[in-house]
């Protein structure tokens, strides 16, 4: 499975990299699509990760993150596309991990269900 390759306590858990290193992607990129109607204002916000360059233009791919609390400084910089509605206790239990400090794979994702509401 895919791992949570970057986990920062009190901030977020990042996943979606097929290589598990933080530097991989799906082989394509697309522009950031932030909306003023979707904000990083609560625990469990799900957003696209990007390179943080050019306001995310052409740097979104397969990576995403789940916030551990409100992160308003990310508004307008990352596209919010969902929220965790069940199982946030599991998300909060993901162990801290810095890919720059460890080459070992992160925690494997066993199952995630995404639904439209």
PLM features: what roles do these ranges have?
Residues 1-117:
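Cyclophilin-like peptidyl-prolyl cis-trans isomerases
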């Amino acid at each position: 499975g895919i791992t949570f390759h970057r986990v920062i306590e009190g901030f977020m858990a990042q996943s979606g990299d097929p290589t598990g290193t933080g530097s991989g992607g799906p082989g394509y990129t697309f522009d950031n699509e932030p909306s003023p109607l979707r904000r990083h204002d609560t625990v469990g916000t799900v957003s696209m990760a990007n390179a943080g360059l050019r306001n995310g233009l052409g740097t979104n791919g397969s990576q995403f993150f789940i916030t551990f609390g409100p992160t308003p400084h990310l508004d307008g910089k990352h596209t919010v596309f969902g929220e965790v509605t069940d199982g946030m206790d599991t998300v909060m239990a993901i162990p801290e991990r810095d890919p720059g400090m460890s080459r070992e794979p992160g925690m494997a994702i066993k199952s995630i269900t995404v639904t439209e509401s």
